[in-house]
Amino acid sequence: MTDLQWETFSYQAVEGASVLYFLAMLAYFVELAGLRTVARDEEVEDRRTAMAGRLGLVLTSFAAAVHLVALVARGLAADPNRVPWGNMYEFTISGTFVVVLAFLVVTRIWGTEWLGPLVTTFVVAALMAAFLGLDDTVLPLPDALNSYWLVIHVVSAVISTGAFTIGALLSGLYLVKSRSTRETGYLARLTDLAKLDRLSYRMHAFGFPVWTFAVLITGPIWAHQAWGAYWNWDPKEVWAFITWVVYAAYLHARATAGWRGRNAAYLALVGVATLWFNFIGINFFSSASQHSYAEGLGQEHSVVVDVLAPVEATQEVGIVVGSDQPAL
């Protein structure tokens, strides 16, 4: 297949995965609509309601498989072939896949299928935003990104993002359930508060060392290789460190101050807010960041690359690339 055929196939696979996620979301909501609005100990699910929930999980699994195919095809569409992490569109479709994968793994281990409606709604919204608002042109990687550190750094960052996102969903559900005076419908499907709190903690405890590896180890090493300095106080670096501090405070407070329940849940939500602001806000609103890779449809974007000169000074080169024109 040619590069153009791989690119077209990737688009079609993403569209197919989006349709499957949407159908899974509908199945989950059909399950919720079929729940009796009575107390947990009186609630009885009919066969069709249970089948809708199982169908939602099966559709989510199939969607994830198609989603993975789309990512592979996206990488094969580039010349030379590369990992699909060259711009915000590619990061979005990669990140949403990891969120779904984390959901499926957690559901397999701890039976958290009740997260399905939230996860599929989030993924459908994110993929729709990627389709409508981001430039999906396949371009070669800038020199600064063309490194094996891209794989090491981004894999760890994306894995931790998936864990933190699932942890935040669990924390949000904890807060909603803890304020409810009567457990009916969806809330009756949730596990008890103690387990919600414990599952959220486990997701954050898993994600934090991976995020540390991405932000404080591989990131600085890669920055030194690309730009000649381990730390540049770039806006994205600063916000990544802020996110690290928030999650460090979360884990420290739980371990030493005995924070549980609402206080820990609020802090977890602050952490995920800084995480996603770093991904979305910095890319769209900070033109000074060397990490900016966001572009809308038909919009020009700037990639700033520091080229180390043979002399002591560092020369900064700006490359402006339009969505419909080749790189200069």
Language-model-detected regions and their locations in the chain:
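Polytopic transmembrane helical bundles with strong interfacial aromatic enrichment
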Residues: M1-L328
